[in-house]
Amino acid sequence: MVHQVLYRALVSTKWLAESIRTGKLGPGLRVLDASWYSPGTREARKEYLERHVPGASFFDIEECRDTASPYEMMLPSEAGFAEYVGRLGISNHTHVVVYDGEHLGSFYAPRVWWMFRVFGHRTVSVLNGGFRNWLKEGHPVTSEPSRPEPAVFKATLDRSLLKTYEQVLENLESKRFQLVDSRSQGRFLGTEPEPDAVGLDSGHIRGAVNMPFMDFLTEDGFEKGPEELRALFQTKKVDLSQPLIATCRKGVTACHVALAAYLCGKPDVAVYDGSWSEWFRRAPPESRVSQGKSEKA
């Protein structure tokens, strides 16, 4: 593994609160609320309008994606991403801090962290502990929407951090990359259904290793430390000195794998953007593994 100085992937609630208190928010520092919830559970934009971190803009993951794709949450184009984040006052010189309101402490924030990185922006961090701990620690909130001055952002896709269906299919034979799936064990094995999914059976890509993303978080919603994270990878026999692809259902919690590896000093984990949603619909049946299906047979 090549050792390099990595931009801090996490910032603390204390650091952000102090940055806000001392007037550092502006073109050089922007905060994004990247919350998203399953339909019928919570309304992310409504909750943002009710209360959010002062100065935060709402990052709508439903809007900032490839809406023409048949698969969930696929990346937008370079131009689409650049236009969207530019409207949020983000330039190539902005430090971006992302959080979400998930009770686990973090869910969609690592996806947005990865999106910035895959489009060439390295000065991006996740708020460690999320909005859950921001509230718990008594930091200020507001209902006032943020209206930043638009900025110019130039997006350059870093293809080394992104894997396609064809590349993962080829990897079944070449085995050049390790493959880690971040969904729950039941969904990975095929013994539990995919939530809110019509026509999508659970299971996994042949050869994948299961590391549920919740294992990277403490009970209090903070990211575990590098030593604990390395131990998790070692337990699963995932070699952080070798190439690694992360996958899940739709390329969201896979970004937790990328973040955890980054915190261990490995910044080059690629995400299979289509993940299981695409794989289930396109891949040969023999490349899909499901205990649930085999038990029914």
Curated annotation (Swiss-Prot):
SUPFAM superfamilies: Rhodanese/Cell cycle control phosphatase. This is Thiosulfate sulfurtransferase. It catalyses: thiosulfate + hydrogen cyanide = thiocyanate + sulfite + 2 H(+). Keywords: Acetylation, Glycoprotein, Mitochondrion, Phosphoprotein, Repeat, RNA-binding, Transferase. Its main location: mitochondrion. The keyword Phosphoprotein applies. It holds the Pfam family Rhodanese. InterPro entries: Rhodanese-like_dom, Rhodanese-like_dom_sf, Thiosulphate_STrfase_CS, TST/MPST-like. Monomer. The modification N6-acetyllysine is found at residues 14, 136, 163, 175, 224, 236-237. It is found in: Mitochondrion matrix. Contains two rhodanese domains with different primary structures but with near identical secondary structure conformations suggesting a common evolutionary origin. Only the C-terminal rhodanese domain contains the catalytic cysteine residue. Its EC number is 2.8.1.1. The modification N6-succinyllysine is found at residues 14, 136, 175, 224, 237. It comes from Homo sapiens.
